[in-house]
A protein has these predicted regions:
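Transmembrane core module of solute transporters
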Residues: 6-70, 78, 99-102, 162, ...
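Structural signature of transmembrane alpha-helices in multi-pass secondary transporters
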Residues: 22, 51-54, 58, 85, ...
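Small-residue-rich segments within alpha-helical transmembrane domains of MFS-like 12-TM solute carriers
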Residues: 23, 27, 93, 109-117, ...
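Helix-loop junctions on the cytosolic side of multi-pass membrane transporters
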Residues: 181-199, 251-260, 357, 427, ...
Length: 519
């Protein structure tokens, strides 16, 4: 516990700095991939390992963060993560080849993986129960706003400077965070460092199995669509490794006296339901964050910077609403807050499922704002419920597990909507093409209009007819793609409505005790 003379809000800002940069890094590199590939003489497919390598190492460290905090001491572990993340960010910007960049991104993911769980545990010990909701609202703002800023900021930096600066910008923030953490943060009395010489044993087999399973899962999710899923021997190999690692790892950890990841925490009903809810929250949040800018660019012709800006008002909405939810969470039944948030967000997604190719930028922004308003009512209440009955000494372990659930949900969600987008587009194209026949009077009218436009543009004869058919096919392709986007929005809305009943299985938290970290 920090010295009482230190303002706890200063500590909150200190530990939020590095977490904001880490979450930002999960999305900021996406738009820079073509520049990275060109500069480092790599193919487009090879350059995607810049993303995959970070996600794999990050996913492996997340559930281990609680165990590592106990082993090393939480402050020491957190500062080590900040130092590794900062140094590897500099090395990423300095990389002279794709291989070097991938290695440094793995290291960056290792450093970043422990930041969020450690920050949540630090905030939990820094603030009294009555103020934790507001404290974790600050953290929640950083976690939600950073992914929405990432694509826009990455594009702006790449266009105006160099792709290397998307990594260099982490360095001064990391150094500042490291210095402030050293001066301001300390471990609470109960959080004593466990030394190996005192008999603390490392379950190397469990550690290896969990790492193998999570790493393989992340590779499958990141590469599956590109390699046509299980038609690829590469994906089948990693599917086998994933099953061996996860099944073997869970069995091993359930039997271990000192588990690396304590899955026994899922015996607590509130923690188990909240972990499942966090999976779906990650699924819907990150999927929609990918879909909206992609739709605006691909179908409506907006530049990348404008498409990214469409998400910003949603981030501002969450920034405004999070403190209000932090105030309400100790006064209103969390089950009602969660139900309200799910209902609003699901309704917004179903409204999006009614969009068409005449959509303007304003209505796209309004849809995201409405969805974000609902999302703001989910993060804090879900986690208040999750940790209501978790012993304080288990907080570090629990934050790692629930963060992992959210990140896996995000990866599964993005992989799902990306696959559905391609396959539903093909399906809708086939259905629309069924209406293309010479006996269809509407088709004749449309072709005549296209032909007239071609002739007025200088084409004539067979060339004009061919151009008219090309214009018709482009129209069908755009319409089919739009329908596929709408199918995805509908799916996400149905998921959010579908999970509402499980929240009424939660036991209402007693606000007088328990630990309340928020993700």
């Amino acid at each position: 516990m920090p010295d009482g003379s230190i303002n706890p809000w200063v500590i909150a800002v200190t530990v939020t700095l590095a977490t904001f940069m880490e979450v930002l890094d999960t999305s900021i590199a996406n738009v820079a991939l073509p520049h990275i590939a060109g500069n480092l003489s790599a193919s487009a497919d090879e350059s995607t390992w810049v993303l995959t390598s970070y996600l794999v190492s990050n996913a492996v460290i997340l559930p281990l963060s609680g165990w590592l905090s106990s082993l090393l001491g939480r402050k020491r572990f957190y500062m080590g993560c900040v130092a590794i993340f900062t140094l590897s960010s500099f090395l990423c910007g300095f990389a002279a080849s794709l291989g070097m960049l991938v290695v440094f991104r793995i290291l960056q993911g290792v450093g970043g993986g422990g930041l969020q769980p450690s920050e949540q545990a630090i905030l939990n010990d820094t603030f009294p129960l009555s103020k934790r909701g507001m404290a974790f609202a600050v953290y929640g703002i950083a976690v939600v706003v950073a992914p929405t800023l990432g694509p826009w900021l990455g594009g702006w930096i790449t266009d105006n400077f160099s792709w290397r600066w998307i990594f260099y910008i982490n360095v001064p923030v990391g150094i500042l965070s490291l210095g402030l953490t050293y001066l301001l943060v300390s471990d609470p009395p109960y959080m004593k460092r466990i030394k190996l010489s005192d008999g603390f044993r490392i379950d190397y087999i469990g550690l290896g199995l969990i790492s193998l399973g999570l790493g393989s899962l992340q590779i499958i999710l990141d590469k599956g669509q590109r390699d046509d899923w299980f038609d690829s021997g590469f994906i089948r190999l990693f599917a086998v490794l994933m099953l061996v690692g996860l099944i073997g790892g869970v069995i091993r950890e359930l039997k271990a006296k000192e588990p690396v990841v304590d899955f026994r925490m899922l015996k607590d009903r509130n923690f188990a339901i909240s972990t499942l809810a966090m999976f779906f929250l990650g699924f819907v949040l990150y999927s929609s964050t990918v879909l909206i800018p992609q739709m605006l660019q691909q179908l409506l012709g907006y530049p990348a910077e404008m498409a990214g800006l469409a998400l910003s008002p949603g981030g501002a909405t969450i920034m405004f609403c999070m403190p209000i939810v932090g105030f309400l969470v100790s006064r209103v039944d969390t089950r009602y807050l969660i139900t309200f948030g799910c209902t609003i967000s699901a309704s917004a997604l179903l409204v999006m499922a009614g969009w068409n190719l005449s959509l303007d930028f304003k209505h796209a922004v309004l849809g995201r704002v409405l969805q974000s308003f609902g999302l703001a009512f989910l993060f804090i209440p879900i986690n208040v419920s999750a940790f209501a009955n978790v012993p304080r000494e288990k907080t570090n372990m629990g934050t790692g597990i629930i963060n992992l659930a959210r990140n896996i949900g995000a990866s599964v969600g993005i992989a799902t909507v990306t696959t559905l987008l391609e396959r539903r587009t093909q399906l809708h194209q086939m259905r629309l093409m069924d209406h293309v026949n010479n006996m269809n009077p509407a088709l004749k009218t449309k072709l005549a209009g296209f032909a007239a436009a071609s002739i007025s543009g200088g084409s004539s004869g067979p060339g004009g007819a061919a151009q008219a058919h090309g214009m018709l096919f482009n129209m069908i392709e755009r319409q089919a793609t739009m329908l596929a986007f709408l199918d995805n929005f509908k799916l996400l809305g149905v998921i959010f409505f579908g999970i509402i009943p499980i929240f009424f299985l939660l036991k209402r938290p007693k606000m007088g005790g328990g630990s309340v970290p928020v993700h």
